[in-house]
């Protein structure tokens, strides 16, 4: 059986009451202070970069979850950040490359397990151009 996205949250984050119960498939409500908390999907963005030979740029994940696997450079959006900005920032942080002109390709819902908690995400993919591939290096969350 699929667990509720807020199953690990036992107390109301507003008043601390234990009367924090499931309201629907993605929210919990406090019977004491009437606060409702929704577990919305976390936004993420990934850069799809091709070189002149048509090869795709992938990075090897340095950390859990899925350490050692290959993925597109990317990560979670920060507060107040657009997905295009997220995509370019993550590309630079993980590879040293400065991208430009991100073009939306597609998005997919995903489940991301972190610290024993399943986070619902919405992963967006962007085609990104880079001017200088020679500046490439692994950094931040990428090991190679």
Role assignments for model-derived ranges:
Residues 1-8, 47:
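A broadly conserved sequence feature marking short terminus-proximal activation segments
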Residues 2, 51-93:
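Conserved Nudix-box catalytic region and its N-terminal flanking loop in Nudix hydrolases
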Residues 9-11, 27:
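Residues immediately within or flanking Cys/His clusters that coordinate Zn2+
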Residues 12-14, 31-32:
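Short, cysteine/histidine-rich loop/knuckle motifs that typically chelate Zn2+
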Residues 20-21, 38:
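Short functional micro-motifs and their immediate structural scaffolds
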Residues 21-27:
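Short linker/helix segments within small regulatory modules
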Residues 28, 32-56, 76:
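Conserved N-terminal beta-strand and adjoining loop/helix that marks the start
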Residues 77-103, 108-144:
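Unchanged
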